Amino acid sequence: MFRLYDTATSEVRELRLRTPGKVGIYLCGPTVYGPPHLGHGRATLVYDILRRYLEWTGLEVRLVSNITDIDDKIIDRANRESRPWQEITHKCENVWFEAMGKLNVRRPTDVPHATEYVEQMVDMIATLIERGNAYVTDDGVYLSVPNVPDYGLLAHQSLDDMLSGGGDREVFGAGNKRHPADFALWKFSKPGEPSWASPWGDGRPGWHSECVVMSLSILGEGFDLHCGGMDLKFPHHENERAQAVALGREFANHWMHNGFVVDTEGEKMSKSLGNVANLLDLLEHYDPRAYRLVLLQTHYRSPVRIGQDNIDAAVNTLGGLDSFAARSQHLVGSVADTDVITRFRETMDDDLDTPSATALLFETVRRANAALDANDPLAGGLVAAVRSMCEAFGLDLKQASSVPADVLDRAAALDAARAAKDFATADALRAALQADGWIVETNKAGTTVRR
């Protein structure tokens, strides 16, 4: 039974599927106005791992992740640079998917663009007005938040508590709103801005209206899981859900949010704070798998600090895994060790506990190396288990090695000597490899040799 923390209920509970054997997931995608940062990378990697694991267990996953291709930030950049807004969104979307490809993030099943669903958004807003849950002002159309009785479910605050605390409320149209928490469903356009026709005047949809329409249009009511970063919980996801409630439509059954990427001071990285680390820089200078491995070693709900130390450590660990893959590539056809796979499923089924599952992976690599050293027939099952876990993680191993077999054998002998606490032999083997021009690095996955 797969269990996940549900933001709405504040508990780890079973992910109950609307249709047995099938999972419908909506992930809020990027607003394409600039390069992706590490926070974007974390969100897409977390949910890529989730998707891969669910498919690994035999479920059919439909992952919908949108592209917000019309937004105030896009318009602002277009105006600053005197460029067509479509040129900016097209280029930034291409950069986004190029980065996701390098991270080995699989393309979502569906990639809806907000501009493709404007007609449906207009229809939804019209329905909200007809139901008395939205109203027209001089600058747009707003949802009447007090008409949503359980507003604040995801934030775990009542509307009164939000207002008394200041809250993170929408500034747009502050002078025209009936209530401070009301938010824009439709924004009337200014001269020169992109716009679409509506019964109330030309304009564009509000951000919160885009995702609720796309998710319900593609996945339908009562879809299984809505995902995104912790920063989207409020107000974006709260406001998405509020519109569905105001429409009288069932929305997501389960809510999942990943933690922040923080800087060295523990501060959340964001563009508004000016401490964003560009994901493209990381991908240019490091093995892209290193970021995935660092995130696997951190629980998805916990904050993660990304620095040169933990990226370097991940690169070294990957080297050990690659050496193991090269050493064991001759073993084919074995069935994965049942005990290992059972333990793996137990940890992953418990709120996607990738840190424990990753520890199990390294433990299995060590056991497999020892079995290979001893020509133990159990080696095949352990090797197959390692491959299976890496498949579920989306962690590709570089099995084609440029390291000669005799060098790999000497590295394995070094590991065997260390395991036997025969450090004199281990040191001698290390010195001999170094004398032959090899860089020798040892970590918890074993010894890596490279030029």
Language-model segments: residues:
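Alpha-helical recognition segments enriched in aromatics with Gly/Pro capping
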Residues: M1-Y33, D48, F97-E98, E119-Q329
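N-terminal, positively charged nucleic-acid-binding surface of large information/translation enzymes
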Residues: T9-E14, R18-R106, V449
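Anion (oxyanion) recognition and catalysis
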Residues: E55, I129, Q434
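Short phosphate-binding/catalytic loops that engage adenosine nucleotides
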Residues: L59, N133, W438
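Short Gly/Ser/Thr- and Asp/Glu-enriched loop/turn motifs at secondary-structure junctions
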Residues: R107, T137-D138, T442-G446
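Phosphate-binding beta-loop-alpha motif at adenosine-nucleotide cofactor sites
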Residues: P108-E116
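Structural preference for alpha-helix termini/caps and helix-kink/transition segments
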Residues: E267-S270, N275-R451
